[in-house]
Amino acid sequence: MNIHEYQAKAIFVDNGIPTLKGKVAFSVDEAVANAKELGGSVWAVKAQIHAGGRGLGGGVKIAKNLDEVKDYASKILGMNLVTHQTGPEGKLVQKLYIESGANIVKEYYLAILFNRMAEQITIIASSEGGMDIEKVAKESPEKIAKVGIDPQIGFKMFHGLEVARVLGLDKDEGKKLISMIAKLYKLYMDKDMNMLEINPLIKTAEGDFYALDAKCSFDDSALYRHPEIAELRDITEENPAEREAAEFGLSYVKLDGDVACMVNGAGLAMATMDIINYSGAKPANFLDVGGGASAETVAKAFEIILRDKNVKVIFINIFGGIVRCDRIANGILEATKNIEVNIPIVVRLDGTNAAEAKAILDSSNLKNIKAATNLKNGAELVKSLVG
């Protein structure tokens, strides 16, 4: 689960992590009033959406007087903000964060995340803050520190010293940053986060560090332990189809391609997407029907993926185990009774009750269903149908 910057910063403040003063605004008048209350002569007017790249997309502006605050707030609030993380459809800006300015002398990047490859919590830090960290990693890998932490040991001084070394900090600056990282690490662990990112982390002329941005992502499976975090969920930021799918026990993520996928198991789903890409087509979604799929949930999956007008072919790839193939076949029939399906459906069923499933589909007389003998054959069929 993701939260907004202003929500993350409120959590930071509660845990002693330095941030600049700021207030959320839901209207232009409130934005101006917030700037007046904060005082000073410079403010950042920041769009609040669940995506990065807001500045490049025009969603972050620096105002040097109250008239500019009003002007920028008027332009940003209600805009459809498109960034490299939103996709071409963008996100509607419904709230702003008005933040006091600061005398910034240096920007850094800092993140704490779970490194699945290394099976460790990892601190990632760079002297190149305010930029796309993937670009820095590609062009200047020597400017990035990756410090692994064994959760059984926790964050120690030597971890912080390595970060300070790569960032080129002096002794006093290093002490301040290490103290800040220790608090961030504790917060990360205590709140069951997947990722905590500050980009940029700034150093002021006084040598102090502040989180100028804040991005926190939480483990959905652990939210029952943190009702105060669950309350921060903003469902307006979530894809409606993804939210609806979750209510039916389906894992669905919309993508930009034209081949809809319906698969059981996350691993097989990713392999299916890979082979679709390899064949020259593009997946339109990730959809895992899970281990408890029924005919009803399969029908719901059909309903959701067919709302995507970009979809030209549906590829159903099921390996029957816990999910019996005949259930999937009955779900396909149930879906086609209630929804008009005018596009080809490529079906690859193998495993438990695969023969029964094939018989069900054969007896249905559905003309737009094409059977695949294996995964490779399925991908080839999909590619030929997409064109």
Predicted feature locations:
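Amphipathic alpha-helical interaction surfaces in cytosolic regulatory modules
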Residues: 324-345
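Catalytic core of bacterial c-di-GMP phosphodiesterases, primarily the EAL and HD-GYP domains
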Residues: 321
